Regions:
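Intrinsic-disorder-driven secretion/translocation and chaperone-binding regions of pathogen effectors
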Residues: 8-24, 131-136, 142, 148-149, ...
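Short aromatic-glycine-(Arg/Gly/Cys) micro-motifs in beta-strand/loop hairpins
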Residues: 50-78
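Negatively charged, low-complexity tracts enriched in Asp/Glu with abundant Ser/Thr
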Residues: 3-56, 154
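A short, charged, amphipathic alpha-helix used as a generic interaction element across diverse proteins
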Residues: 77, 83-103
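Extended coiled-coil/helical scaffolds and adjacent low-complexity linkers that mediate multimerization
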Residues: 145, 155-160, 164-167
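Long, low-complexity, intrinsically disordered segments
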Residues: 167-177
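Short, mixed-charge low-complexity intrinsically disordered segments
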Residues: 2, 101-155
Length: 177
Protein backbone atom coordinates (compact mmCIF):
# COMPACT_ATOMS: atom_id res chain seq x y z
CA UNK A 1 0.00 0.00 0.00
CA UNK A 2 2.94 2.32 0.52
CA UNK A 3 2.79 5.51 2.50
CA UNK A 4 -0.55 7.04 3.28
CA UNK A 5 -0.47 10.59 1.99
CA UNK A 6 -2.62 13.49 3.02
CA UNK A 7 -4.35 15.32 0.19
CA UNK A 8 -4.41 18.60 2.10
CA UNK A 9 -1.04 19.63 0.60
CA UNK A 10 -2.34 19.21 -2.94
CA UNK A 11 -4.84 22.03 -2.60
CA UNK A 12 -4.02 25.72 -2.24
CA UNK A 13 -4.29 27.24 1.20
CA UNK A 14 -7.09 29.46 -0.08
CA UNK A 15 -9.29 26.44 -0.71
CA UNK A 16 -11.74 26.37 2.16
CA UNK A 17 -13.04 22.83 1.99
CA UNK A 18 -12.10 19.60 0.33
CA UNK A 19 -15.04 18.10 -1.52
CA UNK A 20 -16.20 14.57 -0.83
CA UNK A 21 -15.54 13.60 -4.46
CA UNK A 22 -11.88 14.66 -4.09
CA UNK A 23 -11.47 12.46 -1.03
CA UNK A 24 -13.24 9.55 -2.79
CA UNK A 25 -10.94 9.89 -5.81
CA UNK A 26 -7.86 10.02 -3.59
CA UNK A 27 -8.94 6.93 -1.63
CA UNK A 28 -9.58 5.01 -4.86
CA UNK A 29 -6.17 6.11 -6.18
CA UNK A 30 -4.36 5.05 -3.00
CA UNK A 31 -6.18 1.70 -2.83
CA UNK A 32 -5.33 0.87 -6.44
CA UNK A 33 -5.00 -2.90 -6.91
CA UNK A 34 -5.93 -3.50 -3.27
CA UNK A 35 -9.50 -2.23 -3.70
CA UNK A 36 -12.37 -4.70 -3.50
CA UNK A 37 -13.44 -4.21 -7.12
CA UNK A 38 -9.87 -4.70 -8.36
CA UNK A 39 -9.46 -7.93 -6.35
CA UNK A 40 -12.84 -9.10 -7.67
CA UNK A 41 -11.87 -8.43 -11.27
CA UNK A 42 -8.30 -9.74 -11.23
CA UNK A 43 -8.42 -12.60 -8.76
CA UNK A 44 -12.01 -13.83 -8.63
CA UNK A 45 -13.45 -13.42 -12.12
CA UNK A 46 -10.21 -14.74 -13.66
CA UNK A 47 -11.01 -18.23 -12.34
CA UNK A 48 -13.99 -20.59 -12.55
CA UNK A 49 -16.88 -19.16 -10.54
CA UNK A 50 -20.56 -19.64 -9.90
CA UNK A 51 -23.22 -17.02 -9.28
CA UNK A 52 -24.53 -16.43 -5.81
CA UNK A 53 -27.58 -14.29 -5.09
CA UNK A 54 -27.08 -12.38 -1.86
CA UNK A 55 -30.19 -10.29 -2.36
CA UNK A 56 -28.72 -7.61 -0.13
CA UNK A 57 -30.76 -4.47 0.37
CA UNK A 58 -28.84 -2.45 -2.25
CA UNK A 59 -27.65 -0.26 0.58
CA UNK A 60 -25.38 -0.72 3.52
CA UNK A 61 -27.00 -3.16 5.95
CA UNK A 62 -25.82 -4.47 9.26
CA UNK A 63 -23.88 -7.64 8.48
CA UNK A 64 -22.85 -10.24 11.06
CA UNK A 65 -21.24 -13.67 10.91
CA UNK A 66 -22.98 -15.87 13.49
CA UNK A 67 -21.84 -19.18 14.97
CA UNK A 68 -24.99 -21.15 15.75
CA UNK A 69 -25.79 -24.76 16.58
CA UNK A 70 -26.79 -25.22 12.94
CA UNK A 71 -23.41 -23.99 11.71
CA UNK A 72 -22.18 -20.67 10.34
CA UNK A 73 -24.79 -18.10 9.34
CA UNK A 74 -24.48 -14.73 7.67
CA UNK A 75 -27.01 -12.24 8.98
CA UNK A 76 -27.82 -9.40 6.55
CA UNK A 77 -30.29 -7.02 8.13
CA UNK A 78 -33.07 -9.34 9.32
CA UNK A 79 -32.27 -12.24 6.96
CA UNK A 80 -30.03 -15.18 7.77
CA UNK A 81 -28.13 -17.20 5.19
CA UNK A 82 -26.68 -20.59 6.06
CA UNK A 83 -23.03 -20.83 4.94
CA UNK A 84 -21.02 -24.03 4.50
CA UNK A 85 -17.99 -22.65 6.37
CA UNK A 86 -16.51 -19.57 8.01
CA UNK A 87 -14.42 -18.62 4.96
CA UNK A 88 -17.50 -18.46 2.73
CA UNK A 89 -19.36 -16.38 5.33
CA UNK A 90 -16.44 -13.93 5.53
CA UNK A 91 -16.23 -13.77 1.72
CA UNK A 92 -19.96 -13.08 1.36
CA UNK A 93 -19.99 -10.57 4.23
CA UNK A 94 -17.77 -8.12 2.35
CA UNK A 95 -20.15 -8.07 -0.61
CA UNK A 96 -23.16 -7.86 1.71
CA UNK A 97 -21.64 -4.76 3.35
CA UNK A 98 -21.37 -3.22 -0.11
CA UNK A 99 -25.03 -4.06 -0.79
CA UNK A 100 -24.41 -6.31 -3.82
CA UNK A 101 -27.29 -8.34 -5.23
CA UNK A 102 -25.48 -11.04 -7.24
CA UNK A 103 -21.79 -11.91 -7.00
CA UNK A 104 -19.36 -14.53 -8.24
CA UNK A 105 -18.08 -17.14 -5.79
CA UNK A 106 -14.99 -19.18 -6.69
CA UNK A 107 -15.83 -22.78 -7.52
CA UNK A 108 -12.56 -23.92 -5.94
CA UNK A 109 -13.35 -23.77 -2.21
CA UNK A 110 -9.65 -23.80 -1.29
CA UNK A 111 -9.34 -20.28 -2.74
CA UNK A 112 -12.19 -18.72 -0.76
CA UNK A 113 -10.29 -18.28 2.53
CA UNK A 114 -7.37 -16.46 0.89
CA UNK A 115 -9.70 -14.26 -1.14
CA UNK A 116 -11.80 -13.50 1.95
CA UNK A 117 -8.62 -12.31 3.69
CA UNK A 118 -7.75 -10.02 0.78
CA UNK A 119 -11.30 -8.65 0.50
CA UNK A 120 -11.53 -7.97 4.24
CA UNK A 121 -8.12 -6.27 4.14
CA UNK A 122 -9.33 -4.09 1.26
CA UNK A 123 -12.49 -3.24 3.22
CA UNK A 124 -10.55 -2.25 6.36
CA UNK A 125 -7.94 -0.36 4.32
CA UNK A 126 -10.77 1.68 2.79
CA UNK A 127 -12.20 2.48 6.24
CA UNK A 128 -8.78 3.52 7.56
CA UNK A 129 -8.21 5.80 4.56
CA UNK A 130 -11.62 7.41 5.09
CA UNK A 131 -10.71 8.15 8.72
CA UNK A 132 -7.23 9.38 7.79
CA UNK A 133 -8.17 11.62 4.87
CA UNK A 134 -11.26 13.04 6.56
CA UNK A 135 -9.48 13.82 9.83
CA UNK A 136 -10.64 17.09 11.40
CA UNK A 137 -13.67 17.10 9.13
CA UNK A 138 -17.33 16.72 10.01
CA UNK A 139 -18.96 13.34 10.56
CA UNK A 140 -21.35 14.27 7.76
CA UNK A 141 -18.45 14.50 5.28
CA UNK A 142 -17.10 11.13 6.45
CA UNK A 143 -20.55 9.59 5.95
CA UNK A 144 -20.88 11.10 2.47
CA UNK A 145 -17.41 9.80 1.49
CA UNK A 146 -18.27 6.34 2.88
CA UNK A 147 -21.58 6.15 1.01
CA UNK A 148 -20.03 7.34 -2.26
CA UNK A 149 -17.22 4.81 -2.00
CA UNK A 150 -19.77 2.06 -1.42
CA UNK A 151 -21.89 3.14 -4.38
CA UNK A 152 -18.80 3.44 -6.65
CA UNK A 153 -17.60 -0.04 -5.65
CA UNK A 154 -21.10 -1.52 -6.02
CA UNK A 155 -21.47 0.02 -9.49
CA UNK A 156 -18.06 -1.33 -10.57
CA UNK A 157 -18.93 -4.82 -9.30
CA UNK A 158 -22.29 -4.77 -11.08
CA UNK A 159 -20.56 -3.68 -14.30
CA UNK A 160 -18.07 -6.55 -13.99
CA UNK A 161 -20.92 -9.03 -13.56
CA UNK A 162 -21.27 -12.23 -11.60
CA UNK A 163 -20.25 -14.77 -14.19
CA UNK A 164 -22.34 -17.75 -15.20
CA UNK A 165 -24.98 -19.32 -12.99
CA UNK A 166 -23.29 -22.72 -13.29
CA UNK A 167 -19.54 -23.02 -13.96
CA UNK A 168 -18.32 -24.36 -17.28
CA UNK A 169 -16.46 -27.67 -17.23
CA UNK A 170 -14.41 -27.82 -20.39
CA UNK A 171 -12.86 -31.22 -19.95
CA UNK A 172 -12.55 -33.74 -22.71
CA UNK A 173 -13.73 -37.21 -21.87
CA UNK A 174 -12.43 -40.41 -23.32
CA UNK A 175 -14.67 -41.66 -26.08
CA UNK A 176 -14.87 -45.35 -26.78
CA UNK A 177 -14.40 -46.39 -30.36
Amino acid sequence: MGNVESIAERFPKSARAVKAEDIVAEIERQLGDLSIDSIYEKKILSQRTRQYELKAAGKASKVEVLHTLLGIELKIGNRRLLCPDLATARYLSVFAKLGCEIIAVPYDITQISRLADELESGWHRMLVLIDHLATDRSERLKTVVYKRLLSHSRAKLEALGAGTKIPQFNQKTKQRS
